[in-house]
Amino acid sequence: MAHYKGAASEAGRAAQLMKKREIQQQEIEFRKKKIEEELKLDKIENKFATHYDAVEQQLKSSTIGLVTLDEMKAKQEDIVREREKKLAQKKDEKDREKQRALEAIQAEKNKQKRQIQALSFNLDDDEEEEEEDDEDHDKKQLKIKQEDQPKPKWTEIKEDILPIKKKKICKNPDVDTSFLPDREREEQENRLREQLRQEWVMQQAELKDEDISITFSYWDGSGHRRNVLMKKGNSIYQFLQKCLELLRKEFIELKTVMADQLMYVKEDLILPHHYSFYDFIVTKARGKSGPLFQFDVHDDVRMISDASVEKEESHAGKVLLRSWYERNKHIFPASRWEPYDPTKSYDKYTIKDKDKSKK
């Protein structure tokens, strides 16, 4: 047998082809022997004739003298039974020889398969080709066996169900599968997300329910400072309603006024009624002259220290009639006021402490 010199994968394929040729040659020789055996008895009549001729010959040779008809029939039955037994034994021996030959072929094929797998670098292709060869070989062997077996009666015919070969799928445990969809992982993430959402909602609800003391000044050209207790979740409209209840006792012009007719101005910004104090606290909103999220009041920074230094101290918000603003919006301080815009940044109106940054 010549040895192939070249790549290992090509050597494996060459070995497979040689193995396939050997199997085909063995099948051809097996068929030749089978044809030779069948040619010995050409027809089915000759088979039966030979069988009964042998029985008659043995009966004649074993019968001496005159015998009764019953003895003759009994002896003939014994000879036929013995003859059939010998034929069955020969058939069993022939079947066993065929089985041993098939097992030897299969063992040689498995041995060559292991050798090819040990030498080949392309195991997947080789395995697929070998599996195809195995299937073809199994089909041929099954066909040969069916030809050797006697044809069954029509009442005994059953469909042979061949088992379907399933390829084993091996998984690599080291491969990262985090990008693949995983129902359990997604459900766990959703539960965690929902839990965090509920915790955040509870925290915000607790924050909105906290009390806050708001110092404001009723402005009619001069300031009248008052203080009211509210919740952080209350809106500016609710705050103005409470201010109105407090101021009606002192100011006659407010007795017939509704909260819609009032304005709340803080840090030179007119705050819309639908905003809540919580909105300004959470976003750390700033106005022109100070923070909008601080509602406690200190003395004016311009009175106690350098006005160029930025402070986190806020001024008292102004509560005033909208009619007063319309009459005096061209006069300071109303001329400086403007509606609050959440998209606008008011940082440029603040002055940093330059001396502090140098230190």
Swiss-Prot record:
One of its GO terms (biological process) is chromatin organization. It comes from the Eukaryota. Residues 122-150, 339-359 are annotated as: Disordered. Belongs to the FAM50 family. It comes from Drosophila melanogaster. One of its GO terms (cellular component) is nucleoplasm. InterPro entries: FAM50A/XAP5_C (IPR048337), XAP5 (IPR007005). Residues 123-136 have a biased composition (Acidic residues). One of its GO terms (molecular function) is RNA binding. Residues 137-150 have a biased composition (Basic and acidic residues). This is Protein FAM50 homolog. It holds the Pfam family XAP5.
